[in-house]
Amino acid sequence: MSRAVGIDLGTTNSVVSVLEGGEPTVIANAEGGRTTPSVVAFSKSGEVLVGEIAKRQAVNNIDRTIASVKRHMGTDWNVAIDDKKYTAQEISARILMKLKNDAESYLGEKVTDAVVTVPAYFNDAQRQATKEAGEIAGLNVLRIVNEPTAAALAYGLDKGKEDELILVFDLGGGTFDVSLLEVGKDEDNFSTIQVRSTAGDNHLGGDDWDQRVVNYLLNQLKVKGIDLSKDKIALQRLREAAEQAKKELSSSTSTNVSLQYLSVTPDGPVHLDEQLTRAKFQDLTKDLLDRTKKPFQDVIKEAGIKLSEIDHIVLVGGSTRMPAVYELVKELAGGKEPNKGVNPDEVVAVGAALQAGVLKGERKDVLLIDVTPLSLGIETKGGVMTHLIERNTAIPTKRSETFTTADDNQPSVAIQVFQGEREFTRDNKPLGTFELTGIAPAPRGVPQVEVTFDIDANGIVHVSAKDKGTGKEQSMTITGGTALSKEDIDRMVKDAEEHAAEDKARREATDTRNTAEQLAYSVDKLIADNADKLPEEVKTEVKADVDALKKALEGTDDAAVKTAFEKLQASQSKLGEAIYAQAGSPDGATGPAGAESAAGSEGAKADEDIVDAEIVDEDEKK
């Protein structure tokens, strides 16, 4: 049986690990390093360079060197080299191929199976892109695992038998996650690791700290009348110097940034010699650090625990070596010291190797239960986001809900899938759309369309829709799409909290419109079906209220809709009274129940389990 490796595919650095005798070992690359820079370059001779060698030549080959490609995963980003366009998946695949080759050299055998990690807050498109990159690299991706979960797996296996809570604070080169996990062992030493909650920011990491230093140095030069903001070579040298300064300031209180012959101007060569203190560095990046606070607090709140209940805090990612990060985590945790016995650069890959061992049967003493980071649902009438799976639900998971049509004889429904926390789909992330056709002609509200969401262990979404009447089914695996822009996912949760009242009012107005439309339709039908039994004056009065409601529904005044709706609700009872009186006795009539609230007369026979929401035919919307 071939060996499986664990890969931490990072924004700035990547690591590969393997189980040897059941224990994880980090594999050194061909250059002797335990971490490989996530940098790919195309030399002018056509050679593809990856890792340290690509990073070293970046200054002299800027336009043909790609770094931090992880930030583009799941988007339509591409880079043109020698008239050929490369996607983010293809560039990432080059990094994975390098790690694969290094592992094969170390093990002396072919490597095809791998567990690859992603940030916990990666959306569906980003996870799919990561899996595709693995496939391009010739890897069979056994599982996509969240980075904080992998870290907890590596850290938590040697813990005691008591259930313990581990908080993982993962600040990498380009992404940030916080996760709370529960780790426990039974009497047989079988470990269960379950994610309780997770939060994060897909566009926050060490690269942003570096950029602040670059901006500061550029401004210092501007004061002297020198603008290098368009000088690509100078910018690359500044980026490298900024990264080095950041690292040095983790162990010393000041550093000197000295770059001779940084550029050449008409006045001569430009030299940079700037002193940067840790205090100044922390001042330049304070707002970046502040952005880590809310996800931390959200995780604690969603898990419903007290800070004192956290047993261990694990720092992951090279960026957590910054003293300000360590102190902030300690402060947020109520004074509890984060664990210093974990290598933040390697722990994720070690956890990935352990999970690979579990999947290959090398380790049989671990069960890993992860969660989906964002709620999933479909658009129903009025643009409402109807959730089928809530955020922080354990995966894999499956959930079905039955919906109905919005129009008479509607031949098809468009199933529009969204991810996010807001009440309306326009405020959430669209994942994809597919159409269920061939619905048998029937009055609206009669067809039953069962929509099923299935999230696999990789966190990848599969959606299907089935017409219960005809048995016709349509399904899709969510792929492609555009990834979330900076802070998008975090914004979804934040916006949901900030706009809760506004969303509630809009939701109520939409619900009123939907109910009002159903009432007008039902009362109209009741009048038509009983035209010969109703006195003219009753018909005229109620019909006028129906027409008034229909007119209000054509407008945008929600208050007018509510008023007209309430008026029709009151007057429609006269229809039942008139029909009852016409029948002359209870034996000859359907009774008051036969003319109950018209809003219920048409739909009451429907299955009680059917959700009171309608899927709109896209053609009607156009």
Swiss-Prot record:
InterPro entries, sorted: ATPase_NBD (IPR043129), Chaperone_DnaK (IPR012725), Heat_shock_70_CS (IPR018181), HSP70_C_sf (IPR029048), HSP70_peptide-bd_sf (IPR029047), Hsp_70_fam (IPR013126)
Induction note: By stress conditions e.g. heat shock.
Modified residues (Phosphothreonine): T175
Organism superkingdom: Bacteria
Gene Ontology MF terms: ATP binding; ATP-dependent protein folding chaperone; unfolded protein binding
Pfam families attached to this UniProt entry: HSP70 (PF00012)
Family matches, as NCBIfam families: PRK00290.1 (NF001413), prok_dnaK (TIGR02350)
Protein name: Chaperone protein DnaK
Organism of this sequence: Arthrobacter sp. (strain FB24)
